[in-house]
Amino acid sequence: MDLISTQELKEKLDRGPDDFKLVMVMGEWEYQAKHIPGSLRINTLEEGLEALGPDEDIVIYDSGPACVASRRAYRVLKNHGYERVRCYAGGLEEWESAGHALEGTGIRRV
């Protein structure tokens, strides 16, 4: 699995999000509560396959190291011929712990 570190992702975002797609693979309410700036959210993997080009540079993330959603999405994309996919395994948990900016309402469903 091709991984990207917190520092590498921060550097990519600082250069500008136009050269890659940052994709959060979590539910709508989780996305609304908080996400990494510049992220888009995919409802289903089928929707992701339609929205993301196989030649695009893609970074997938979820809530953190204990969540398997990003790893599952990574495997599906790779199996469908997407070569430039990386997984940010640290997810929101590591991003927030590093003190980097988040977007969203901050309100989580209980």
Positions of PLM-derived features:
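Rhodanese-like catalytic fold shared by cysteine-dependent sulfurtransferases
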Residues: 1-21, 28-60, 64-110
